[in-house]
Amino acid sequence: MAKNLNTVSFTVLLLVLLMASTGILETEAACFKFLGECGAVPFPGTNADCTSCCVGNFGSAVCAGRVEVEGGVKHCHCYGTS
């Protein structure tokens, strides 16, 4: 039993190291930094309109623009990597 557990643990460790070294684990998690708001409040457009507004204001650092409701009012929130 212990030998099987050691083999499984070693295999899992190798898989995690392989995934980390090849960048497989990289996701859009880097896209969680709030850059600011964009456009009018309440924001009248869609997520695509929001992303366009964000790119216009914040440049290439933007990886997502989302219309989110705060207190019943729609806002355009910009998220990026820097």
From Swiss-Prot:
GO biological process, one term: killing of cells of another organism
Annotated compartments: Secreted
Signal peptide: 1-29
Cystine pairings recorded for this chain: C38-C63, C50-C76, C54-C78
A Gene Ontology cellular-component term: extracellular region
Domain of life: Eukaryota
Alphabetized UniProt keyword annotations: Antimicrobial, Disulfide bond, Fungicide, Plant defense, Secreted, Signal
Similarity annotation: Belongs to the DEFL family.
Name used for this protein in its record: Defensin-like protein 208
UniProt lineage: Eukaryota, Viridiplantae, Streptophyta, Embryophyta, Tracheophyta
